[in-house]
Structures are given as structure tokens and as C-alpha cells.
């Protein structure tokens, strides 16, 4: 039998949960509005689509309370009028600030009803001007603030409602350029109204000739919802009745205008004027022209790209544009154009704290400033010869660059899309509270991301909810901007050298390519183009990978002190090693490796030569599980590996060749880690010392093995390190100062043992000193007793006898840094015990010896500095340089080591620590000496890294000094700042040196 089941019908009225209403008061709010019947289902679903439905509902409750009897009219319209519903719910769910405005001015909802359109620029200006003129100025300028502020907020309300309506209902989407242009028109109207009020306040009926030039985003007609409006004022100095006071009056008007606009509309910023905030607020046109011709910096011409008359005297405003814009298009010819552009880019990057960089839409990596900077630079470079680039807005400029072949059309379109997406998010973030911000929500704030996604009309995609889609899109867009940022500059350059497989169109001319490379920091653009042609001209896989790699590599190179040298080095490496299958693949697949390699190549002449013969070190530029691979393994294990590699060969020449191979690799590793900021200077010096010690040990072992007679080894030999080798503080350009000590084995005559040991020592020196393509391995024995005229090798007893009877003060001083480094350890240890009696005698060295040391130091200061050297910047022998610090420390050791055992130390830095701990010198003075030693050592090492050969003299201002600054770990390649710091530090240290040596 068929039984009919009772009908079950799901209620049509959605629950608050299904509507996305989370406020516990939401049910009561709906009841209060009467939105709780089946007639309201469609309205409720519209409400649910608001970016923040709870905020929209609460604002509606407050609005209903304020409307009182007029609420019924709005309530009735909301049931049937979809456009009104979309505009109202969307704007209330997007902007708490505009919700407050609407509640305070409840009748303003009518602005959103009916056929709503955006007024033209002329209509806006007429409306605002009329409002400004209708104010009773006798009551003071403040009387004009409320009506004009309300008018401005009403116009913002209408624009915002139209802008976000499509998030709620099927309303037309306002293009970003339309929104930004209207905001700029609104700002122009507000500036005009503020100028009228200010003029009436200051001058009454008189009208001083004053033009307001919009700059920045307002000037480009791409303004944000909330932004300072950048302006420049131009006045005219008119003589009247023998007096010239128009400019003073105009200045008072300009100041009053800025104050009034700040109270009624937005902050007006005139800091882009000549001389910035220190300059005159209002200048004549002639004064502006004179300033820009003589004093203006590159960034000031870049700012003029956006200049546009916005308010005030239109003829004067246009005259300003006509006079100054031609200068903009010749700015790239200025001598300091490239360094100033690079400095601007660095400043922008430094503005953003590292902990919020990933949240910064504007200034973060892959953000809006990256796009704007790239576009403006390309305009400055090519606008001199192409008037189609004389446009102000970023979007228009991108289109013009694409049309002109300076940027690939697809790249221009993609960059525009990314730019507009990021600007849309910026607009939504500002709209919420009408506050100036460019900061994305905190990563953990899911609710804020959910709101932002809905306000930006981002919907779930089946895999992610709306906020998940937004997060993924942000990553994608940021990566795309970073990638396109490089392509904008360099991809068309590659096509200009004849490779059209990139699908960019016809590309730019060779002349345009040279201009662009010059603007990006290449001093030899023709050579750079030749390198690009060679790199991309390779056939098959190599050429294709180079075409993919080069835009990004060139972008990274442009941030280095010497991109020309870097590109040449990269070409040489590619020519030599591109047949290694891993070489190009690693650069393509591991961005960290490629970026680090470009920094190294564009900074150092020393490292590329090593990489040519040790390319495997490039693979160490990658990151391993525990950090950079360049830092994997310790010094001791690497030293053991070097000695072991040499020990595999009986032939000394082949053994030394094996040792050189590992030394080359190790030098490339240390130097790379140094330039990349992974090692501090103390670690660098210790690592370089460990390499030298291992080479000496390997050479000594193999030579002894090759020269051992059938009767056995005639003598034990130890190598004593002197100078910086003994102190464990070698630099890249340091020789190895050593002494050889021997002791006959049992049954061997001393003369035979010494003769054999001399042969070993001479062969070690000869093998290591053989010329090669690697950095030299000079073994210097000049610090032995009697200097170069003394025996090359002595027995321990001979050393003891000589030092006890004949040692000169300088020889005692030299022993302060003696340390066993290779050979027989027990013999080396006994040598040091013997040396201790000489260098740390009971009661200290004699007063006459101290006096002799002081005399020698004075002679060194006067005579040893090379001819033509600058004593202020010679890192070794100059004022407050290494010699000054080391001699000072050694003098204190000679005087006090018998009292302070901690001074029995061959390291300058460790001895300085002991001097401070023993309070032999004031701690402040010790710190000055320590800082000077570290500064000079960094500089001296950096000189070798940059120039590729040992040198002690800092260069003058220019590329090389900038590179030295970067290689020395200064933090930027600002050579001027680095040099100022060097001079300051060494000057202070020299004062301490004089105090100690004089006392």
C-alpha cells in the first residue's frame, strides 16, 4: 500500500551561520531591522556577500536609528533595488570609516540610489569651488572645514560604493585606472577649494598669482584612497607701487592652503620642492629653473616625471611644465646619473625593516615600488629620443614601453596586471579605516586575510577558500613582479643582439640597448652587448639556458660595484665550464647559487680567477641542511685533506700540484664566503693561516720523503711561523714568514744534518715558489737570525746561542709572534720554550731595548712608506694602520709579558684582550686599537679580493673603492661612507699609538 510521507521543506530564511554572521548580536540586529521574513531572503544573501557582513549589518542598524522615520523608505528600496543594495552593503562591509560617515550624515545614502555616475573633473572642481566661495569667510577659515570635509567624504563614499559594489551584486567593475584617476580629480578639486579658502583668508579679494603643481601619484593621476598629496608651489614676484610682496603673500597663502587641506581633506606635502623642507615654500619660475639647472639631483628629475598643474593659475602652471620637462629627458646624460639611481634603489630597500618586508605591498621585494622604479628608469633612459614615453602614469608608461619595443608586449601586459592587482589590495586596505597603509595583515591573521580577499572580490577556487586563494595569488604576483622586473630591463637587450626566439617582437635598437646598459651601471655598454651576443649565441641547450638566465643574472649584476667586470667574468666562466652539465643547470635551478655568484663576480677580481680552475666551488654556493655549503666542514678537516692529497704522490712536483689544487679550492671557498658576508675577518684570517700551514706541512713531508737516504732521515725539521703566520692572522696577500730549525738524529753529524736540512728547506721554498696561475706561495725567511745573510737552517742549540748572545731588539720583537706550524712538533715546542726566555725575560726587556724599538718605529714611520703613498689610507704602514697597532701591542708585550702571562700570545687581537684585562691601557683605548686593527685588516683583505693582487693602498673615490667597501663587509657599496669610517677609526687609533710610544 502506498503511503504519502509528510512534506519536509527546508526553511527559506537562512540562519545567521549560513549568512556568515558571527556577531552574537546578529539575530537581534536582524530582528531590529525587520529582516526576518521570507521576503528578505534575497536581501539577506546580498548582505552575506559583503566583505564583512557583521560590520555592514551593524552599520545598517546604526543608520536606521539615525534615519528614524526615513528608514522605511530606504528599507523598502533595499528589498527591490539591487544596485542600491550592492553599493550600500559593499561599502559598509569594506569601510568602517565610510560607515561612520554615513551614520553621521544619514541622508547621504541617497547619493547611492538611482543612476549613479562619477562626475567629471570639471564638475568636481565647480562643485568644490562653489562650496569654497559660499562659505562666510568672516567667521574664519575653520568655518569652511565641516561643509567641505563632508562634501569630500560624500564623493569618496560614492566612488567607493561603485568600486566595491560588484562584490555583492552583479554590478559593473570599475577599472583601477578609473578609480585612481577619479581620486586624483577629487584631489585636484579639493586643492582648488583649499586654495580659494586660503586666498580669501589671507588676501581677501586680491588673488596672488600662484600655481599648485601636483607631484607623485596625484600628478600621475593614479592616486590612492588615502595618501599625502605631493605638491610644488610656483609664484610670481610682481612689483606693485614700487613694492615686491607678491611672493611673500603667495607663501602665506600656500601655507594656509596646506593647513586647511590637512584639516578638511588630506595632508599636503611640499617636501619635493627644491632644497626639500629647508627650501622656500614658494619660488618663482625662474628660481625653479635655475635650481634644476644647477643643483637638482637625479631623484628630483625622476620626481618631475609625474608633475602636472593641479590648481591655481593655469598659465603659470603650464609655464612651469614647459620649462622643466625638457630637463627631465636629459637627466640620464648627467655624470652621476648611474650612482644616484643605484643609491635611490638601495635607500628604498633599506627603508623597510626586514621583519615586515614580506608584508609590504609598496616597498617590499616584488612590490609596487619595484614596478614604478623600473618603469621610471626606462622612461628616463629612452624618453630623450622617444616622446611616446612622455607620460606620467605607470600603466600608461608600461603600455608605451611595450609599444616602443623597450619592453616585451606580453611582459608589459603581465606587469600591468600585477601592478593593478597590488594597487587594488592597497586600495582595499586603505579603504577599511581611511588610513594610509601599504601593509598586508599579519601572516597569522586569517580573519583579516578573509576580509581582504572578499573586499578584493576573490572567491574560493575549489582547493582553497578565499583567503587561501589570496595568499597563493600574492606569492604568485610577487614572484612575477620580481621576475618581470629583471625582464623589463634585460630581455629586450638580449633581442637587440640578434636573438628573436624570445617572442618579444622587434626589440630595441643597438643604440637604445647601449643607453639602457649605461643607465644600469655598465661603463662599457658596447662590450657588454658583445658579451651578451656571445652568451646567447651558443647553439642548442646552452644558448637556450643562457637566454632564460641572463635577464635575472644581469639584474643581480647591476647591483654590484662593477657589473662590467662581472659580466666579463661570467662570460669567461661560461666559455670555460658550460660543457660541465651541472654548471648552467645549477644556475638555472638554484637561484641562491646564481645570485651569490653574480655578487662575487661583480665585486672581486681575485675569486673569478680561482673559479676558472676550481669551478666545483660554485656548487658550494648552494644551501645545505645546516646552512651554506661554503661553511660546511671545519678548518682542521680541510687542512688534513690537503696534506693527505699531497701524500699520495712520491714525486714532489705532482704532490705539490695536488696540494695547490686543494689550496685553490680552499682559497676560492674562503674568499667567496668572505665576499658573501658569511665569515667575519677573524675567521677569514684563521682559515687562510690553516691553508698555509697545511701547504707547508704537505711540502715538507713530500720533500723529506723524496730526499731520505737509505740510511734514514738525517735530522728532524720544524717550521716556525713568524709574523702574521705565527699569529694566525694571515691575509689574502700575505707571504709566509718562517724559520727552519733542525736537530740531528742519533748518530748523524751536525754538519751533515744541517746540510741535508738546508737542502730540504731550499727545495720546499723552490717548489712552493714556482710561478703558477694561482696566488703566489712565497716562503720568506728574512726574519731569521742575521737576516738574509744568516744560515737558512740552524740547529736548536745554534738558535739558543745566537739569541742569548747576539739578538738585536728587532729580532727579539720578531720572536713575539714565533709559533710552531709544521714539521716535528716536539722540536717546534722546544724551540718555543727556548724563545720564551728571550721574548719574555725575567724582569722584562731592558730599557735600552725598549728605547731602540721606539727609535726603529720612528724610522719606519718616516722612511718605509712607499713613495707616493697616502699615509692616511695605507692599510699597513699608514696612520693607525696594521703596523701601528701591531708595534704598539708588541711594545707592551716586551715591557709587561714577564708580569702578565696572558701576554704570552702571538695573536695581536688576543694580546690586546690581555692588555685590556690587565688594565695596562685604558679599556677605551684598547677598543680603539682593536677596532682599527679589524678595520685595516678587513680593508687590506678587501683590496686583494677586489684587485686580484696584493696591495696596501686604498683607492680614491670610484668603483674600486665601492667594491672594497662591499668586500670589506661595510654593508653597502658606498665607498665614501666606508672611507670616512676608515679615516675616523685610524685617526683615533693613531692618537693612542702616540700616547703609548711617547710614554
UniProtKB/Swiss-Prot annotation:
Species for this entry: Mycolicibacterium smegmatis (strain ATCC 700084 / mc(2)155)
Cofactor (UniProt): Mg(2+)
Name of the protein this chain belongs to: Bifunctional glutamine synthetase adenylyltransferase/adenylyl-removing enzyme
Keyword Ribonucleoprotein: no
EC identifiers of the protein: 2.7.7.89, 2.7.7.42
Keywords carried by this UniProt record: ATP-binding, Magnesium, Multifunctional enzyme, Nucleotide-binding, Nucleotidyltransferase, Transferase
Family from the record: Belongs to the GlnE family.
Class of the enzyme per the UniProt entry, highest EC level: transferase
One example GO MF annotation: [glutamate-ammonia-ligase] adenylyltransferase activity
Catalysed reactions, semicolon-separated: [glutamine synthetase]-O(4)-(5'-adenylyl)-L-tyrosine + phosphate = [glutamine synthetase]-L-tyrosine + ADP; [glutamine synthetase]-L-tyrosine + ATP = [glutamine synthetase]-O(4)-(5'-adenylyl)-L-tyrosine + diphosphate
Magnesium is among the record's keywords: yes
UniProt-annotated stretches for the region Adenylyl removase: 1-493
Function, as annotated: Involved in the regulation of glutamine synthetase GlnA, a key enzyme in the process to assimilate ammonia. When cellular nitrogen levels are high, the C-terminal adenylyl transferase (AT) inactivates GlnA by covalent transfer of an adenylyl group from ATP to specific tyrosine residue of GlnA, thus reducing its activity. Conversely, when nitrogen levels are low, the N-terminal adenylyl removase (AR) activates GlnA by removing the adenylyl group by phosphorolysis, increasing its activity.
GO biological process: regulation of glutamine family amino acid metabolic process
Region (Adenylyl transferase): 498-999
Cellular-component GO terms for this entry: cytosol
Amino acid at each position: 500500500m502506498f503511503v504519502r510521507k509528510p512534506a519536509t521543506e527546508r526553511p527559506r530564511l537562512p540562519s545567521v551561520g549560513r549568512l556568515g554572521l558571527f556577531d552574537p548580536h546578529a539575530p537581534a540586529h536582524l530582528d531590529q531591522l525587520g529582516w526576518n521574513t521570507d521576503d528578505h531572503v534575497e536581501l539577506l544573501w546580498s548582505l552575506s556577500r559583503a566583505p564583512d557582513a557583521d560590520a555592514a549589518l551593524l552599520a545598517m542598524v546604526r543608520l536606521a536609528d539615525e534615519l528614524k522615520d526615513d528608514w522605511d523608505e530606504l528599507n523598502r528600496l533595499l528589498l527591490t533595488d539591487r544596485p542600491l543594495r550592492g553599493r550600500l552593503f559593499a561599502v559598509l562591509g569594506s569601510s568602517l570609516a565610510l560607515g561612520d560617515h554615513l551614520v553621521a550624515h544619514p541622508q547621504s545614502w541617497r547619493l547611492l540610489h538611482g543612476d549613479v555616475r562619477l562626475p567629471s573633473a570639471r564638475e568636481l572642481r565647480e562643485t568644490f569651488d562653489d562650496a569654497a566661495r559660499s562659505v562666510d569667510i568672516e567667521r574664519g577659515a575653520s568655518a569652511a572645514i565641516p561643509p567641505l570635509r563632508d562634501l569630500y567624504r560624500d564623493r569618496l563614499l560614492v566612488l567607493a560604493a561603485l568600486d566595491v559594489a560588484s562584490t555583492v551584486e552583479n554590478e559593473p567593475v570599475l577599472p583601477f585606472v578609473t578609480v585612481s584617476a577619479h581620486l586624483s580629480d577629487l584631489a585636484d578639486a579639493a586643492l582648488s577649494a583649499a586654495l580659494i579658502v586660503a586666498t580669501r583668508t589671507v588676501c581677501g579679494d586680491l588673488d596672488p598669482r600662484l600655481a599648485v603643481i601636483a607631484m607623485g601619484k596625484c600628478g600621475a593621476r593614479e592616486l590612492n584612497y588615502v595618501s599625502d598629496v605631493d605638491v610644488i608651489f610656483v609664484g610670481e614676484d610682481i612689483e606693485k607701487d614700487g613694492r615686491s610682496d607678491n611672493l611673500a603673500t603667495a607663501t602665506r597663502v600656500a601655507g594656509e592652503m596646506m593647513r586647511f587641506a590637512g584639516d578638511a581633506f588630506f595632508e599636503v606635502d611640499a617636501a619635493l620642492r627644491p632644497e626639500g623642507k629647508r627650501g622656500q615654500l614658494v619660488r618663482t619660475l625662474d628660481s625653479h629653473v635655475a635650481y634644476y639647472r644647477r643643483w637638482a639631483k637625479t631623484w628630483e628629475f625622476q620626481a618631475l616625471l609625474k608633475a602636472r598643474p593641479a590648481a591655481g593659475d593655469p598659465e603659470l602652471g603650464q609655464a612651469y611644465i614647459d620649462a622643466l620637462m625638457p630637463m627631465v629627458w636629459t637627466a640620464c646624460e648627467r655624470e652621476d646619473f648611474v650612482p644616484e639611481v643605484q643609491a635611490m634603489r638601495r635607500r628604498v630597500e633599506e627603508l623597510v625593516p626586514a621583519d615586515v618586508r614580506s608584508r609590504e605591498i609598496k616597498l617590499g621585494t616584488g612590490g609596487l615600488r619595484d614596478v614604478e622604479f623600473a618603469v621610471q628608469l626606462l622612461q628616463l633612459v629612452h624618453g630623450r629620443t622617444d616622446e611616446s614615453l612622455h607620460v606620467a602614469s605607470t600603466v600608461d608608461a608600461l603600455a608605451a614601453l611595450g609599444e616602443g619595443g623597450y619592453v616585451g608586449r606580453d611582459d608589459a601586459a603581465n606587469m600591468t596586471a600585477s601592478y593593478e592587482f597590488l594597487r587594488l589590495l592597497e586600495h582595499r586596505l586603505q579603504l577599511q579605516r581611511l588610513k594610509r597603509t601599504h601593509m598586508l595583515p599579519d601572516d597569522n591573521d586569517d580573519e583579516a586575510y578573509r576580509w581582504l580577499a572578499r573586499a578584493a572580490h576573490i572567491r574560493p577556487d575549489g582547493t582553497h577558500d578565499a583567503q587561501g586563494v589570496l595568499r597563493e595569488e600574492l606569492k604568485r604576483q610577487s614572484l612575477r613582479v620580481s621576475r618581470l622586473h629583471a625582464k623589463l630591463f634585460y630581455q629586450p637587450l638580449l633581442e637587440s643582439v640578434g636573438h628573436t626566439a624570445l617572442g618579444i617582437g622587434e626589440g630595441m635598437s643597438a643604440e637604445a640597448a647601449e643607453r639602457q646598459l649605461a643607465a644600469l651601471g655598465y661603463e662599457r655598454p658596447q662590450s657588454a652587448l658583445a658579451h651578451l651576443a656571445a652568451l646567447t649565441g651558443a647553439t642548442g641547450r646552452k644558448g637556450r639556458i643562457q637566454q632564460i638566465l641572463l635577464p635575472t643574472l644581469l639584474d643581480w649584476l647591476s647591483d654590484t660595484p662593477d657589473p662590467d667586470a662581472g659580466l666579463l667574468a661570467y662570460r669567461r666562466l661560461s666559455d670555460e665550464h658550460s660543457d660541465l652539465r651541472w654548471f648552467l643547470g645549477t644556475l638555472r635551478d638554484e637561484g641562491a647559487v646564481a645570485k651569490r655568484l653574480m655578487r662575487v663576480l661583480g665585486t672581486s677580481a681575485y675569486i673569478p680567477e680561482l673559479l676558472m680552475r676550481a669551478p666545483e666551488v660554485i656548487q658550494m654556493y648552494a644551501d645545505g641542511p645546516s646552512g651554506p655549503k661554503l661553511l660546511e666542514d671545519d678548518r682542521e678537516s680541510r687542512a688534513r685533506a690537503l696534506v693527505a692529497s699531497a701524500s699520495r704522490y712520491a714525486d714532489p712536483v705532482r704532490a705539490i700540484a695536488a696540494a695547490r689544487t686543494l689550496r685553490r679550492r680552499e682559497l676560492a671557498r674562503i674568499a667567496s664566503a668572505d665576499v658573501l658576508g658569511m665569515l667575519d675577518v677573524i675567521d677569514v684570517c684563521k682559515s687562510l693561516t690553516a691553508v698555509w700551514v697545511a701547504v707547508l706541512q704537505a711540502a715538507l713531508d713530500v720533500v723529506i720523503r723524496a730526499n731520505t737516504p737509505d740510511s734514514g732521515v738525517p735530522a728532524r725539521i720544524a717550521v716556525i711561523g713568524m709574523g702574521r703566520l705565527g699569529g694566525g692572522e694571515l691575509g689574502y696577500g700575505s707571504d709566509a714568514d718562517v724559520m727552519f730549525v733542525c736537530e740531528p738524529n742519533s748518530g748523524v753529524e751536525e754538519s751533515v744534518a744541517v746540510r741535508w736540512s738546508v737542502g730540504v728547506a731550499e727545495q720546499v721554498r723552490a717548489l712552493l715558489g714556482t710561478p703558477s696561475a694561482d696566488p703566489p706561495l712565497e716562503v720568506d725567511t728574512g726574519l731569521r737570525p742575521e737576516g738574509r745573510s744568516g744560515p737558512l737552517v740552524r740547529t736548536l742549540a745554534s738558535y739558543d746561542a745566537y739569541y742569548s748572545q747576539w739578538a738585536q731588539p728587532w729580532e727579539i720583537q720578531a720572536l713575539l709572534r714565533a709559533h710552531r706550524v709544521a714539521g716535528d712538533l716536539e722540536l717546534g715546542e722546544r724551540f718555543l720554550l727556548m724563545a720564551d726566555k728571550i721574548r719574555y725575560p725575567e724582569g722584562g726587556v731592558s730599557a735600552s731595548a725598549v728605547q731602540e724599538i721606539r727609535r726603529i718605529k720612528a724610522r719606519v714611520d718616516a722612511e718605509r712608506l712607499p713613495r707616493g703613498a697616502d699615509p692616511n689610507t695605507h692599510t699597513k704602514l699608514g696612520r693607525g694602520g696594521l703596523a701601528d697597532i701591531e708595534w704598539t701591542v708588541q711594545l707592551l708585550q716586551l715591557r709587561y709579558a714577564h708580569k702578565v702571562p696572558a701576554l704570552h700570545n702571538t695573536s695581536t687581537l688576543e694580546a690586546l684582550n690581555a692588555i685590556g684585562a690587565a688594565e695596562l691601557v685604558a679599556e677605551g683605548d684598547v677598543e680603539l686599537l682593536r677596532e682599527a686593527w679589524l678595520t685595516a685588516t678587513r680593508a687590506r683583505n678587501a683590496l686583494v679580493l677586489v684587485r686580484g693582487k696584493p696591495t696596501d693602498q686604498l683607492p680614491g673615490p670610484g668603483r674600486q673603492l665601492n667594491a672594497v667597501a662591499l668586500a670589506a663587509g661595510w654593508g653597502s657599496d658606498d665607498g665614501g661612507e666606508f672611507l670616512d669610517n676608515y679615516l675616523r677609526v685610524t685617526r683615533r687609533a693613531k692618537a693612542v699609538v702616540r700616547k703609548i710610544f711617547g710614554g
